[in-house]
From Swiss-Prot:
Required for the formation of a threonylcarbamoyl group on adenosine at position 37 (t(6)A37) in tRNAs that read codons beginning with adenine. Is involved in the transfer of the threonylcarbamoyl moiety of threonylcarbamoyl-AMP (TC-AMP) to the N6 group of A37, together with TsaD and TsaE; this reaction does not require ATP in vitro. TsaB seems to play an indirect role in the t(6)A biosynthesis pathway, possibly in regulating the core enzymatic function of TsaD. One of its GO terms (cellular component) is cytosol. NCBIfam families: T6A_YeaZ (TIGR03725). It comes from Haemophilus influenzae (strain ATCC 51907 / DSM 11121 / KW20 / Rd). The gene is tsaB. Belongs to the KAE1 / TsaD family. TsaB subfamily. It is found in: Cytoplasm. InterPro entries: ATPase_NBD, Gcp-like_dom, T6A_TsaB. This is tRNA threonylcarbamoyladenosine biosynthesis protein TsaB. Keywords: Cytoplasm, tRNA processing. One of its GO terms (biological process) is tRNA threonylcarbamoyladenosine modification. Pfam families: TsaD. Its main location: cytoplasm.
Length: 236
């Protein structure tokens, strides 16, 4: 779909990124913006739309990194996505940050078996393993990622015990954060943080399958249970 226009944003980690698919071309802005996501993300969105001469109401759908990641970052991303989508009446596509890094591994390194570990602090990682598969449906043939280890928060030891093989491509900050991984020669790669650029392809597949939600259905995914999420005031 050459005419599909998608906007993606991610604030789930210390990286802050936005990306745009417009007329078949992808553009993106990516910054390290620890603790300044709330100040940077809206100007970045304004900039990327202005560079293409677009207004938010000309976007077909909004994708966002729904977690896991830092509590504050995931919450900011969900809140910004909800506000933008509600204001412009946009359908929303939540994207897993772990799967977005797997997509980066495919686009940059042709990896099709990817294990992700984001440092979750407290001697834990956000962890999953996915493989890229061709799928046939009423919407045609496309590729999607299938989980072989479900998204979870776990200790490095628990992650190691679940690994299907040592040959999967490794992404995320978790590998370098804990000695348990390095002792097993499980090192990371050049893909350490999620980037909205690699959410665009995932979002396009979801959009074509009509897998979208409304602004009011947005739910951040923390993978830890002690955090509550408040929707827009008066819309609980």
């Amino acid at each position: 779909m050459q005419n599909l226009t998608l906007l993606a944003l991610d604030t789930s980690t210390e990286a802050c990124s936005v990306a745009l698919l417009y007329r078949g071309e992808k553009t993106h802005i990516n910054e390290l913006a620890q603790r300044t996501h709330t100040k940077r993300i809206l100007p970045m969105i304004d900039e990327i739309l202005a560079n293409s001469g677009l207004g938010l109401n000309q976007v077909d759908a909004l994708a966002f990194g729904r977690g896991p990641g830092s509590f504050t970052g995931v919450r900011v991303g969900a809140g910004i996505a909800q506000g933008l989508a509600f204001g412009a009446d946009l359908p929303v596509i939540p994207i897993s940050n772990l799967t977005a890094m797997a997509q980066a591994a495919f686009e940059l390194h042709q990896a099709e078996n990817v294990v992700a570990a984001i440092d979750a602090r407290m001697n834990e990682v956000y962890f999953s393993q996915v493989v890229r598969e061709k799928v046939r449906s009423d919407f045609g043939e496309f590729f999607q990622w299938r989980e072989i280890i479900s998204e979870q928060v776990c200790s490095p030891e628990q992650a190691i015990n679940q690994l299907q093989n040592d040959n999967a491509f490794r992404v995320g900050t978790g590998w370098a954060a804990y000695s348990q991984f390095t002792e097993k020669n499980l090192t990371g790669s050049d893909i350490a943080l999620p980037n909205a650029l690699y959410m665009l392809e995932l979002a396009q597949v979801e959009y074509l399958q009509k897998h979208t939600i409304s602004a009011l259905e947005i739910e951040p995914i923390y993978l830890r249970n002690e955090v509550t999420w408040k929707k827009l005031p008066g819309r609980e």
